[in-house]
């Protein structure tokens, strides 16, 4: 009798898992901004590459669904998600109170501190006094744009928003910007450690404000896609527990990108 009950319990458990996966779409369209190396970019062949891409592909594999990546400007990602043009966002998307009013998030993917970069030797610091009269580049729709607009733009700082990060770096190196505010890791790995960024460096400490920058990044999802959120969370927990996350992270970073 006990063996029969155990067998039935196992069958019920397996059936529940199968039903859970069956509720997911066969293909998950994931939106990402491909100008944000090393998280998301394209190689010479036009293939999607980066830490976000690796994470997304691994989670989809464990969820038993097919991932389709969709390139987009950053500020179009949430509108595209809400319009059902994509099913998820994996693009260094910070988990903030404001965004959670519009969409849902998975558990944390990794930390996301923000920091200024400027020419080496520049006295610029992330303070109003230092930035007054200066031109500061930010990514449209980003937490950095929201912070700069509320704290600097109305007080004498020229905050310039761009459709993608590559345009910011281009104007910075051309001298049209005095500084740029963006994700610290993206700035370090995607610009400062590259040939184009050799004459630039971080300007001052990280900019801290939980109201704007939240508690790390997550997968952006529609609020009613509860099964998809649960599946992403389960897959993320598994790959962190079995060491896959750390193995993938070491491909891109020489520090703990997940944070505390």
UniProtKB/Swiss-Prot annotation:
It is found in: Periplasm. InterPro entries: Lys_Arg_Orn-bd, SBP_3_CS, Solute-binding_3/MltF_N. One of its GO terms (cellular component) is outer membrane-bounded periplasmic space. Its main location: periplasm. Gene3D superfamilies: Periplasmic binding protein-like II (3.40.190.10). Residues 1-22 form the signal peptide. PANTHER family: LYSINE_ARGININE_ORNITHINE-BINDING PERIPLASMIC PROTEIN (PTHR35936:SF23), MEMBRANE-BOUND LYTIC MUREIN TRANSGLYCOSYLASE F (PTHR35936). This is Lysine/arginine/ornithine-binding periplasmic protein.
